């Protein structure tokens, strides 16, 4: 075997020779690389390589050959094909071979080697290299011999007939061509950049603990027969070479145990020390101590023995105690010639082992920041293997020791970081498993807690684990019961800290205890009593943690119990050395339990690292417990909801007597109810007539027979729907009836049924009747502001979703399913129509859909049969029906508007009372005079644009548009009168919008004399005057209606005359008044000084006289003074 020289030029070290075959072939020199390239190019084995290259023997390991193959493949990908035609290998197919197999042919004069089978002198690895080389050469040959014309021809054939090419590949392609194609595809794939750190970490995690403890370059891991030989080779090296070789030995070691063993063995070789010990720094910044990682290690001590002995007898040395402790505290080296003469030396170990310590050299190990991470100590210098008690460590030994420990400090810190990363990796894997368990075991709290405790015990290596759960009263007691159980205390009462602690202690009562013992013991679940908890020391510690919310790490249980005045249970304290106890909290930072670890396996206290890991377990435990409890509570609430729905369904369903009565009633024709007219009104219908009218609509649409709806089921459903409407002022059952009638009129009179299927007509009528079920008299914004359960349940279109859910609830009630005869597909279709139609009554949805609908109309749409088009059309029809009261005759419209206003005003009162906010104008009772103006705005923004586009597209529904226009004129007229101060809104209904004179039948109406003072409108208000601060709508109506000349305007005179002379029913005037205007003088001096608080105005006084004729009989008695006051108020 050819030797590879060491970097220093000397013989190979035994450390290098003791490595495995995989680690022996590390990096190739330039010569080796050149050899690999020449071999890949076809140079036969045994050929003379280029200068500076190392020969590759025929007996090389397969690992090296694989590496060379890989290197050749990568270099071939990045190197252009050779252009030397004379030395090319040619790819030929021999005649008579049907499989198309090729063979390598070399030019004359070159040595040829058969490629079919390797020669007996060739190894399989060499044959594989040659086979790989042949394939690469064939690919290079193919790429150089093919002309561009051939490539274009093949490409054109492939593009024109790809199916034929695929068929040729699958049926007739030679195997070699397929393998070459596959190889070409593999070579074209991008290579992933190798990550040494990631590969090393994955190899480390995948290896067994036995493999992980082995050092690939460790002298101590060599066989017993090779140790003297290795030591002899190391002794042959000079000091510099030996130093560098031992540094390389520890440079890449990541296992902390193996690294420490290497350091002590190598230091013994460098300083001729008999044995050594290595201590690592642990603890917090305020309480640091040394832990003996390996103790009394000689050059012959095996790694396993050293680790076992250190684990069995863990030695802890505080900083500042003993020789090693002083070195760690002062960071100064200590060199002692005679140990027994030094007061810091502890001879107990010598007495115990029988070994005598003479010379000691102790030196600190620091990291790059200068912090102490360990202390190395060597004992008793030897001379060539012979121990002489008088020998001491000289300055040269100290310098060698210091230099070597500098490199060792880097290695130790790297190994510690790697150990931390491995620990974090394992912890993350466990936490991922815990997260998986939370989802898998969310319905079983016992299994979940048991899994968490098992993982915590195995990771933290403790003897026992316990979890205490606090009684939270989750969803068990009602609010009233909680108030009675815990009455409110006065806010000013002074509470002592002890009282507060006791109150918290009583509040955090443990109800469930989970205990997990040894490895093969099952978890124990119990419900301890109050007496059992009070007599247990472990329970008292858990109670303290639950009350304070603090983590407790107890090293001495007896001392802690004495300091905190807790009950001391002898049987528990005797078996307990260390306790780590931590609160378990939910998302609201409320303690829901306590997790407790008892006794680490090696008898040492729990460290801060243990507490950090255990904190993650506590968080996941809290998440799992909270999730499980929420799941259990959700199941209970769902069960309660089912019971409540059953009760609600029973009480929401119409009684059997009512159903039978309606079933037997005679249903009048549609004309008698005026169902075909857009001017339908329900004022004259009693409640039973409203139900009969609904039944008639279903009959006229032929829905009962078409969908085989049982008549008694339909009657019960109509009565149940009526029963589930609340008695609010507007959004009640009668509003639903009017909406359904308008839909019926649009379908029949408006001829919209020609665009709908029978199933869609059924869905639209059901949606109209159910679109405001269980309306509370408040809108969606109010539900959101008050954070009502409905707003939490439905984030958008709150009330509309609730209406649909109520509709579904009634349909699912026994004896109310009018869709029971439908097929599953028809049932899904009609329910989709009902849902979409009900949600479309939300004006927010109307504004979203309006633009798309207008776009369809502008594009001349006439079919309306697509799914999206039909949905838009149905949505616009639902909105048109929902606001159809605006198109009713005026005597109906203004009464309905007053009902709507009263319902809005009630909501405004609730906002003032509950939310302490100022409602908007339409809901503010104090601004009721603005109702006509707001009605005009509502018509202009929503109603008229909708009815106009529907009327243009479907001309048969023009009455809706015309009625809306007429009502807009009436509301505009009323708004102008209110603005001029000629009327006010203070009646129960707006049936008498203007106060009028009523003539008496038996009293002669005499002239009424009154004066009207007109102010000079040309006079500008002085700055700071009272009039300048008066709102415009609160100023005198006469002033607002005057012209600059002081006379009443023409529009005002016509409106005043109409109001005074015409009655509400449009009959002839009952009274005749003559209104005389006075001439207004404008001789006021604009520059005359006036008082800011008393503005001066001038004008002439005019007399107005009114003569009346005899009034008709039936008028009211009105005295003279009352008439005068009313007329003055009007003006």
Curated annotation (Swiss-Prot):
As recorded in UniProt, its EC number(s) are 3.1.4.35
Q: Does the keyword Hydrolase apply?
A: yes
Gene Ontology CC = membrane; plasma membrane
Protein keywords:
Cell membrane, cGMP, Hydrolase, Lipoprotein, Membrane, Metal-binding, Methylation, Prenylation, Repeat
Q: What's a single GO BP term from this record? A: cGMP metabolic process
Q: What does this protein do?
A: Has a role regulating cGMP transport in Malpighian tubule principal cells.
Name of protein: cGMP-specific 3',5'-cyclic phosphodiesterase
Q: Which organism is it from?
A: Drosophila erecta
């Amino acid at each position: 075997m050819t030797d590879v020289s060491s970097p220093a030029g000397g013989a190979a070290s035994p450390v290098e020779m003791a490595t495995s075959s995989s680690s022996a072939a590390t990096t190739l020199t330039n010569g080796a690389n050149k050899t690999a390239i020449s071999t890949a190019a076809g140079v036969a084995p045994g050929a003379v390589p280029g200068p500076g290259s190392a020969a590759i023997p025929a007996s090389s390991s397969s690992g090296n050959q694989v590496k060379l193959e890989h290197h050749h493949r990568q270099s071939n990908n990045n190197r252009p094909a050779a252009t030397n035609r004379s030395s090319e290998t040619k790819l030929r197919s021999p005649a008579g071979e049907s499989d198309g197999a090729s063979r390598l042919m070399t030019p004359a004069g070159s040595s040829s080697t058969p490629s079919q089978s390797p020669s007996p002198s060739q190894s399989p690895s060499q044959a594989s290299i040659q086979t790989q080389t042949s394939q690469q050469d064939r690919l290079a040959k193919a790429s150089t011999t093919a002309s561009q014309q051939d490539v274009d021809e093949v490409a054109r054939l492939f593009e024109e007939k790809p199916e034929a090419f695929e068929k040729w590949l699958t049926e007739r392609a030679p195997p070699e061509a397929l393998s070459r194609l596959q190889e070409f595809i593999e070579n074209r794939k991008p290579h992933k950049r190798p990550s040494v750190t990631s590969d090393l970490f994955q190899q480390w995690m995948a290896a067994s603990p036995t493999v992980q403890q082995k050092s690939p370059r460790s002298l101590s891991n060599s066989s017993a027969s090779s140790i003297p030989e290795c030591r002899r080779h190391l002794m042959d090296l000079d000091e510099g070479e030996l130093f560098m070789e031992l540094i390389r030995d520890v440079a890449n070691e990541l296992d902390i145990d193996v690294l420490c063993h290497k350091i002590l063995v190598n230091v013994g070789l460098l300083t001729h020390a008999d044995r050594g010990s290595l201590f690592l720094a642990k603890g917090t910044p305020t309480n640091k101590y040394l832990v003996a990682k390996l103790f009394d290690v000689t050059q012959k001590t095996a790694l396993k023995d050293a680790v076992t002995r250190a684990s069995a007898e863990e030695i802890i040395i505080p900083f500042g105690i003993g020789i090693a402790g002083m070195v760690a505290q002062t960071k100064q080296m200590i060199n002692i010639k005679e140990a027994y003469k030094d007061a810091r030396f502890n001879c107990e170990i010598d007495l115990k082992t029988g070994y005598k310590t003479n010379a000691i050299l102790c030196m600190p190990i620091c990291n790059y920041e200068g912090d102490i991470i360990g202390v190395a100590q060597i004992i008793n210098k030897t001379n060539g293997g012979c121990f002489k008690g008088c020998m001491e460590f000289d300055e040269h030994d100290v310098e060698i020791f210091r230099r070597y420990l500098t490199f060792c400090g880097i290695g130790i810190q790297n190994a510690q970081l790697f150990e931390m990363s491995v620990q974090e990796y394992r912890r993350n894997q466990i936490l991922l498993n815990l997260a998986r368990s939370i989802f898998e075991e969310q319905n079983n709290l016992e299994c979940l807690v048991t899994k968490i405790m098992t993982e915590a015990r195995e990771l933290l290596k403790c003897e026992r684990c316990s979890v205490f759960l606090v009684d939270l009263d989750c969803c068990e007691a009602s609010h009233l019961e909680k108030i009675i159980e815990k009455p409110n205390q006065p806010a000013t009462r002074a509470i002592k800290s002890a009282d507060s602690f006791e109150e918290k202690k009583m509040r955090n009562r443990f109800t469930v205890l989970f205990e997990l013992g040894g490895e093969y013991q099952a978890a124990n679940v119990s419900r301890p009593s109050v007496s059992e908890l009070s007599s247990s020391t472990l329970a008292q510690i858990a109670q303290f943690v639950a009350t304070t919310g603090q983590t407790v790490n107890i090293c001495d249980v007896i001392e802690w119990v004495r300091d905190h005045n807790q009950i001391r249970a002898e049987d528990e304290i005797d078996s307990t050395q260390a306790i780590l106890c931590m609160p378990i909290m939910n998302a609201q930072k409320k303690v829901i339990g306590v997790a407790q670890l008892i006794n680490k396996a090696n008898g040492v206290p729990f460290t801060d690292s243990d507490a950090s890991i255990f904190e993650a377990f506590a968080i996941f435990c809290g998440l799992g417990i909270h999730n499980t409890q929420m799941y259990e509570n959700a199941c209970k609430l769902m069960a309660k909801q089912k019971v409540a729905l059953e009760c609600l369904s029973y009480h929401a369903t119409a009684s059997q007597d009512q159903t039978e009565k309606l079933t037997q009633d005679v249903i009048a024709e549609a004309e008698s109810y005026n169902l075909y007219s857009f001017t339908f009104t329900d004022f004259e219908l009693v409640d039973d007539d409203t139900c009969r009218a609904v039944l008639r609509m279903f009959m006229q649409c032929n829905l009962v027979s078409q969908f085989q709806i049982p008549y008694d089921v339909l009657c019960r459903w109509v009565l149940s729907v009526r029963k589930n409407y609340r008695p609010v002022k507007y959004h009640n059952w009668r509003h639903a009836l009017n909406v359904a009638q308008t839909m019926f009129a649009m379908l029949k009179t408006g001829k919209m049924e020609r665009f709908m299927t029978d199933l869609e007509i059924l869905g639209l009528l059901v949606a109209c009747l159910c679109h405001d079920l269980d309306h509370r008299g408040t809108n969606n914004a109010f539900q959101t502001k008050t954070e009502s359960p409905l707003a939490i349940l439905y984030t958008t279109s709150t009330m509309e979703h609730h209406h649909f859910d109520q509709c579904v609830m009634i349909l699912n009630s026994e004896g109310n399913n009018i869709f029971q005869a439908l097929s599953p597909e028809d049932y899904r279709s009609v329910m989709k129509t009902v849902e979409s139609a009900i949600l479309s009554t939300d004006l927010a949805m109307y504004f979203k859909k309006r633009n798309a609908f207008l776009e369809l109309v502008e594009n001349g749409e006439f079919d309306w049969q697509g799914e999206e088009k039909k949905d838009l059309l149905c949505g616009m029809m639902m909105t048109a029906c929902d606001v159809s009261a605006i198109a009713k005759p005026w005597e109906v419209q203004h009464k309905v508007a007053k009902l709507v206003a009263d319902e809005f005003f009630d909501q405004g009162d609730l906002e003032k009372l509950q939310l302490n906010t100022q409602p908007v104008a339409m809901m503010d009772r104090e601004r009721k005079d603005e109702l006509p103006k707001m009605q005009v705005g509502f018509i202009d923004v929503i109603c008229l644009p909708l009815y106009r586009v529907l009327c243009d597209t479907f001309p048969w529904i023009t009455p809706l548009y015309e009625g809306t226009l007429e009502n807009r004129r009436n509301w505009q007229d009323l708004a102008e009168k209110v603005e001029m101060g000629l009327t006010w809104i203070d009646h129960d209904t707006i049936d008498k919008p203007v106060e009028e004179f009523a003539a008496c039948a038996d009293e002669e109406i005499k002239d009424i004399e009154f004066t009207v003072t007109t102010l000079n409108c040309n006079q500008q208000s002085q700055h700071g005057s009272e009039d300048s601060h008066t709102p415009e709508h609160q100023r005198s109506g006469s002033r607002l209606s005057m012209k600059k000349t002081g006379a009443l305007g023409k529009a005002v005179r016509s409106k005043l005359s109409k109001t005074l002379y015409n009655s509400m029913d449009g009959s002839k005037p009952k009274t005749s008044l003559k209104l005389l205007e006075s001439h207004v003088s404008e001789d006021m001096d604009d520059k005359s000084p006036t008082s800011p608080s008393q503005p001066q105005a001038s004008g002439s006084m005019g007399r107005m006289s009114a003569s009346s004729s005899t009034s008709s009989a039936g008028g009211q008695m009105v005295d003279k003074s009352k008439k005068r006051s009313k007329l003055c108020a009007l003006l």
